């Protein structure tokens, strides 16, 4: 790489010149990189011997650059010591390096032949508008705004535009007017071109011209003519005129509207036209509009801020493949927005499903502003996708976007010969059309992808519920097994002791009813049929994910777009003087692209219908899973209640048994101590058939007393007392020796 004059090989120390970034009227701008630290800076050096006046201008630029500090004005930095030398008696200017190139490079890309995308236009409007406002607030007029003097820098994935080259900038403090200028004529304000006194409004003209070119792909006024020619034809235009073109007849047609095609959303077009009418006013006194007394700034900046602050939601209707846009007033609810969508599309609010690009359904509890991301502008940057929940079959494809008049003209007769200069515009619109078809497919594919992500979210929810259901079913099964075994054991032990212990028909009946309920609840826990349906859906979703139609199928369309771009580039390089050509090859590409789009859209909508059908199956299945889960939980709670109730009854049974044992022990002790004819009458019957229930604990009963009987049995009393004592002792030992350990299991 050629080294700038004055720099000897090796003189830069660790700094190495990597490439020349640009060449201006007096200087070169080169990229320098530090060999060790990976630092990069742009160095502007003088390439010519300068006159005293131009040397002053050069030094003035350095002075201006060093005092500025704004995100949208390129920053000056210190020249590295190893490079800090004078070249042609003027110092070097070191600046931050912006790796994205300049705006001209972006505009020259064939895919931008009909203008930039809306997001790029609005980003440029915001950045450069902010930079110009900053310069003017610091009493600096740039005077040479043009695409070559706007550079792009990627900052955290976002493109930032910066103003460079203040070589022709005018510090207003040095004098309010200036009548000398040597700048770029195509973007020059009329008063500068005519060498008349000027003010800061010259930057408005240049800025408006740039923005118009970014929108349309060409400058606003007879762009194919030299300024000397078009100035005379345009100078008497209406103040609201923002566009002029020459008809085939040679007549100039004026318009207050933006030409088509362009990428601006319909809601942005009108305010943008109003803004351009202020910026492209021929009269410098009226240009930019009056100063707003409240905001203390020209009307053009007020309107610019209004455009940039518009909250616009862009919605792709997947049932019609059409984009609809809505301006969101402050605090509008989502329901209000859905009502507007219903009026526009005919899809009632209850059937609308609005998905973000990540497949998340919009939250009806949040305002409609959730459809708009902060700092993200343009329909090409963010989209919300509208689905009709009442439909699972989306027929598609739909009619392709309409052809412009120019493109339709060559499609009707591809062999017609047109002048090269006219053909360039026609083919530019053809490239825009082909690119548009590809972008239409890409947007619909993003909508399909949102539907797939939504399906996967539903599937994840179904999987979570399935796991919860299986877990609940397994827990119920385990509890039922425990309940069944424990109640069987309880019934067995109860039967063993009831012949000589405690019994209750009412309790026994309740326990048997519990056992029957437990058998019924076992059926509630059977969920195999639901598991089968869920697994079938999982398999279906896996197949949809593997399907080639779930991946982008636009390779052929991209190839056709590139062929159209290559044809257009070849045409641009052909000389335009008195040359003609037909459009046979370009029309072939257009036809093939339409056919390709038709094919991939059929596949896309077929796949989309399967996605939506599968999602509907999940929606239908979820309530069944919820009911099954609810039934299992209810059964689980009932089983636990029955278990608890039975345990309480057992403890009550134990309490009664202990009470009975204590009572009998007390009676036995009394009989052992002293038996008299009077006390013998209180001895209980010894019948083994006597029934003991929970409600009636056996106590000493009154027996028939007879003096005669006492006399007859007095001799046998000692023997009887012994028998009663032994029976009482045996009964107590039997109750205490029962196995009650199951209660603590």
UniProtKB/Swiss-Prot annotation:
NEMO-binding: annotated segments: 738-743
Example GO BP: negative regulation of NF-kappaB transcription factor activity
Positions of the Protein kinase domain: 15-302
Location within or outside the cell: Cytoplasm; Nucleus
Positions of the UniProt region annotated as Leucine-zipper: 455-476
Reported modifications of this chain: Phosphorylated by MAP3K14/NIK, AKT and to a lesser extent by MEKK1, and dephosphorylated by PP2A. Autophosphorylated.
Domains as described in the record: The kinase domain is located in the N-terminal region. The leucine zipper is important to allow homo- and hetero-dimerization. At the C-terminal region is located the region responsible for the interaction with NEMO/IKBKG.
Subunit structure: Component of the I-kappa-B-kinase (IKK) core complex consisting of CHUK, IKBKB and IKBKG; probably four alpha/CHUK-beta/IKBKB dimers are associated with four gamma/IKBKG subunits. The IKK core complex seems to associate with regulatory or adapter proteins to form a IKK-signalosome holo-complex. The IKK complex associates with TERF2IP/RAP1, leading to promote IKK-mediated phosphorylation of RELA/p65. Part of a complex composed of NCOA2, NCOA3, CHUK/IKKA, IKBKB, IKBKG and CREBBP. Part of a 70-90 kDa complex at least consisting of CHUK/IKKA, IKBKB, NFKBIA, RELA, ELP1 and MAP3K14. (Microbial infection) Interacts with InlC of Listeria monocytogenes.
Protein name in the entry: Inhibitor of nuclear factor kappa-B kinase subunit alpha
